[in-house]
C-alpha cells in the first residue's frame, strides 16, 4: 500500500517521475512480492517462517530439511495462500483496484487484528475513493 500511496501523491502533484515510479512498482511486484514470496525468515533455531513477523507459523526447519525443499513445498496452506493471495482476500482488499500491486498489504497484521489472514489490512490508509 505504501507504493500505491506514493504513486497517487506523485500523480496529485503532477510529478514528472510518477510514471517511472509506477513502472518500478510493477517491475518489482510491489507488496505482492512479500511474505512467503520474496521474503522468508530463518530464526536462530533454524525454523523457517514466511517472514520475521510470522514467528507463530513454522514451515519447517533447515536443520532437518534444506531451505529449498521447505520453500518449494506446496503442502503448507498458508504459504500456498500467501503465494496466491488475491482470490483469498476479503472486504475492501478483495475489490481494491490496486490489489495486483499492493497484494493486500500485510497479511500477518490482518491475522493478528482479526484472526483471518485474508481479511483487510487494518492499517490500510488508502481511502475508499482511492481504492475504487
Put a short name on every predicted segment:
Residues 44:
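A cytosolic small-molecule/anion-sensing beta-strand core signal
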Residues 33-36:
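Short, small/polar residue-rich loop motifs at catalytic or cofactor-binding pockets
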